[in-house]
Amino acid sequence: MEYHMEYSPNEVIKQEREVFVGKEKSGSKFKRKRSIFIVLTVSICFMFALMLFYFTRNENNKTLFTNSLSNNINDDYIINSLLKSESGKKFIVSKLEELISSYDKEKKMRTTGAEENNMNMNGIDDKDNKSVSFVNKKNGNLKVNNNNQVSYSNLFDTKFLMDNLETVNLFYIFLKENNKKYETSEEMQKRFIIFSENYRKIELHNKKTNSLYKRGMNKFGDLSPEEFRSKYLNLKTHGPFKTLSPPVSYEANYEDVIKKYKPADAKLDRIAYDWRLHGGVTPVKDQALCGSCWAFSSVGSVESQYAIRKKALFLFSEQELVDCSVKNNGCYGGYITNAFDDMIDLGGLCSQDDYPYVSNLPETCNLKRCNERYTIKSYVSIPDDKFKEALRYLGPISISIAASDDFAFYRGGFYDGECGAAPNHAVILVGYGMKDIYNEDTGRMEKFYYYIIKNSWGSDWGEGGYINLETDENGYKKTCSIGTEAYVPLLE
């Protein structure tokens, strides 16, 4: 390569110009320059793309966690993907902080010296709780025990969010899926601790190899055991003096009733019968935040009678009984028999459309809204040793059950957990079955008989709203005291 300087001898030299004269290797040099140019071009394009992403990410973030059916976004997949990177984790933390902070925006900050929140809950160590207001001090006060049990927390602290991201992430999804709203940030943190403890218990149970059922998180996740029992397990029963109480005018005799509906030559199949497979069960409903299990159990069994005897699907009003049953206590509990008595005295049930369910919202009894009434003539008490017979030939049975707070997170299988001390919940017995299962103690397959029970906690609870409880071939075994009170309504 030769290097030349060009200038005019008659002029003052102002600028030198460089001229490259290519020799034999000029082609390779040109290729090298072109490669450098391409690299620079790609780099510039990449930087431009990064800038474009930076200025548009806020807009994208707004729709990232939407729950719209139109955009088909899978929240679990997105969040799990984000958890794989540090930047993704930080993004989730920022969204959680935005969510938590929003609870304080509509409420004025408490002044210095406001009443301190001591959070008197299980798992909180009073000596570690320095009585720091969650509103006035949004730092520190976050600990997690070695067994992942949250003792106390501060959802405003980024370090806590990062250290407990999995649980906080699950809580965030729980809030979204169940549309949970809390009035204050203190309430939210209280619910987070309860949620964390419930989640821990669920995980510990599902690791067991000797249990026949599984648990799963659901809408009850932010309720303490005491709160769950007070809201959902408040059925009233006649107790041990049931047989000493005066006979109810609408109660029929079992032997007379079974003779009417059971064919003389019938042979009872004690292995399996499921009214869900024979058009005798209506859809699962949800009593929501109201202790109205007694109404759902009694109304559900009446719906089954209309389905079996009239061959038609009717959905009747539980809210009518909650509002108008003078012998029961609305959302604060009731008796199955009183529900049937008042059902008859009121002239029948309204349709669900005419008298819709509003849960725990206050309502005044208003029977004028009913366009048509659907009544029963009487009801019959089922003897302890006749459950399978009555179920097969009469239909689903309104029964009491001694449930415990372990029922709250039942997901599926054969429930073999703890039971309540006494009957406290009303459900519907809709069938029975048998399955061969492996017994680890004996090392062989054994026949396992069970009852199929319809609950009133929504179809997202249990096995589509149902739970399976152990019995025996004759149906005499009553797990969790099922059927201490058992009745079938009669249309004729």
UniProtKB/Swiss-Prot annotation:
Phenotype reported upon loss of the gene: Lethal at the asexual blood stage.
The keyword rRNA processing is annotated on this UniProt entry: no
TM segment ranges: 36-56
Protein name: Falcipain-3
Record-marked site positions (Cleavage): 242-243
Motif Bipartite vacuolar targeting signal 1: chain residues: 16-25
PROSITE patterns assigned to the protein according to its UniProt record, in alphabetical order: THIOL_PROTEASE_CYS (PS00139)
Keyword entries, A-Z: Cytoplasmic vesicle, Disulfide bond, Glycoprotein, Hydrolase, Membrane, Protease, Signal-anchor, Thiol protease, Transmembrane, Transmembrane helix, Vacuole, Zymogen
Post-translational modification comment from the UniProt entry: Auto-cleavage occurs at acidic pH. The proenzyme is the predominant form in late trophozoites and both the pro and mature enzyme are present in schizonts.
Keyword presence, Hydrolase: yes
Cytoplasmic-side positions: 1-35
GO biological process, one term: proteolysis
Description of how activity is regulated: Inhibited by cysteine protease inhibitor ICP.
Role description: Cysteine protease which cleaves native host hemoglobin and globin in the food vacuole during the asexual blood stage. Preferentially cleaves substrates which have an arginine at the P1 position and a leucine at the P2 position.
Species the sequence originates in: Plasmodium falciparum (isolate 3D7)
Motif (Bipartite vacuolar targeting signal 2): 84-105
